[in-house]
Swiss-Prot record:
Disulfide bonds: none annotated. This is Glutamate-1-semialdehyde 2,1-aminomutase. HAMAP family: HemL_aminotrans_3. It comes from Paenarthrobacter aurescens (strain TC1). Its main location: cytoplasm. One of its GO terms (molecular function) is glutamate-1-semialdehyde 2,1-aminomutase activity. One of its GO terms (biological process) is protoporphyrinogen IX biosynthetic process.
Length: 439
């Protein structure tokens, strides 16, 4: 079979001789869908262009950051101006406080904010901070929730770990793993039991605000509020991981859509992706008394040469300034439109499925209409073999989907009628391909 992207093929062959698996993040290798990954050379609005000159409507959006669309003029202008002033100073800059003020204004649970460069750094620091603040060692996480690649939270992780069917990661010591209690998601009774057995030693519960790394999973009614109640009762902290959902699912993140109205707040939150507008930026924030345990005012150490990088801060300020309530309303409407079209095409092809949704994020789970997906076990039981032919049919039609059934679909403010029509027109053939798949 002749490839229709020979330049990407050549680039991948070269990359495999230079980098493990030819990639710098495993999901990019197309491991669960097969075929050669496409090498992208440019992005504009709702579109990606690969090294062979082929254009795709993008439903990955850089895994979330491109909320406004790729290469948004206001973001580019801010970045260009920042670059002209210098790339990195090794000192504080005005936009660090400007971005922190925007986050604090939008997310009332944030009283202090610390900038870092990656989501993994944010969750790693939040866990260290929780242990330092409480004087306890154990952390509760949920199977299928992904919090970056720090050792203690890779047990039963979602995302690329789920894609590769790995239970965790080699290189994580037994002693490190023993300090993490892994519980089933959406099961408050299991959380209550864990605190009954280990409560005096539990520093924190960490959870994705709405999981999106085992496919999208909606927190059950009262689940996150219940975590807040239980942690408070036992003197532990609740860490809400909004690296993916923060400023993507809503103006104040997923907590702003749900928790604020329900009357509870996490002790710490982590942010990434959208907060940097496509630049490597992340943050952790929360209660002032907890955050002030960080150095230089507290005993918990954290540092980073490129934390608060001026170019990244400029991109973040421009992105959040332009991410208005109207933008979220538009993306929400497009998300509902596309998920309805997806479900209709799968129904017409006779493919059993459920659409999993959290705000404007959604994913499809095959063979799950009877029970849906509420936790990691449900996600693993789906007919995931149907996704690869579905993915490649869409790819051949010029639509770039996440190369894993365990990832969310992302839309942006740049997905106009032309982009949406191209996606919708490609769905019937992809649905038929999924229908014809066999395990």
């Amino acid at each position: 079979m002749t490839s229709n992207t020979p330049v990407s093929d050549q680039l991948f062959d070269r990359a495999r001789s230079l980098m493990p698996g030819g990639v710098n993040s495993p999901v990019r290798a197309f491991g669960s869908v097969g075929g050669t990954p496409k090498f992208m050379v440019s992005a504009k609005g709702a579109y990606l262009t690969d090294a062979d000159g082929k254009e795709y409507v993008d439903l990955v959006c850089s895994w979330g950051p491109a909320l406004l669309g790729h290469a948004h003029p206001a973001v580019l202008d801010a970045v260009h101006a920042a670059v002209d002033r210098g790339l990195s100073f090794g000192a504080s800059t005005p936009d660090e406080a400007n971005l922190a003020a925007i986050v604090k204004d939008r997310v009332s649970a944030v009283e202090r904010l610390r900038m870092v460069s990656t989501g993994t750094e944010a969750t790693m620091t939040a866990v260290r901070l929780a242990r330092g603040f409480t004087g306890r060692n154990l952390i509760i996480k949920f199977a299928g929730c992904y919090h970056g690649h720090l050792d203690g939270l890779l047990a039963a992780a979602g995302s690329g770990v789920a894609t590769l069917a790995l239970p965790g990661s080699a290189g994580v010591t037994e002693a490190t793993a023993a300090e993490t209690l892994v519980l089933p998601y959406n099961d408050l009774a299991a959380v209550e039991a864990a605190f009954a057995a280990h409560g005096k030693n539990i520093a924190a519960v960490i959870t994705e605000a709405a999981p999106a790394n085992m496919g999208v999973v909606t927190p059950g009614e009262g689940f996150n509020a219940g975590l807040s109640r239980i942690t408070k009762e036992h003197g532990a902290l609740l860490i809400l991981d909004e690296v993916l959902t923060g400023f993507r699912t809503g103006y104040a993140g997923y907590w702003g859509l749900t928790g604020r109205q329900e009357g509870w707040a996490p002790d710490l939150l982590t942010f990434g992706k959208v907060i940097g507008g496509g630049m490597p930026t992340a943050a952790l924030g929360g209660r002032a008394d907890v955050m002030d345990y960080l150095a230089p005012v507290g005993p918990v150490y954290q540092a980073g040469t490129l934390s608060g990088n001026p170019v990244a801060m400029a991109a973040g300020v421009a992105t959040l300034t332009n991410a208005t309530p109207e933008v979220y309303a538009y993306v929400d409407a497009r998300s509902l439109e596309l998920s309805a079209a997806l479900s209709s095409a799968l129904d017409a092809a006779g493919v059993d499925h459920s659409i999993q949704r959290a705000g404007n994020l959604f994913s499809v789970a095959f063979g799950t209409s009877a029970h849906g997906v509420h936790n990691y076990d449900d996600a693993q039981r789906q007919e995931s073999f149907r996704y690869a032919p579905f993915f490649h049919s869409m790819l051949d039609s010029g639509v770039y989907l996440p190369p894993s059934v365990f990832e969310a679909w992302f839309l942006s403010a740049a997905h106009d009628d032309a982009a949406m029509n191209r996606i919708v027109d490609a769905l019937p053939a992809a649905a038929k391909a999924a229908a014809g798949a066999s395990a």
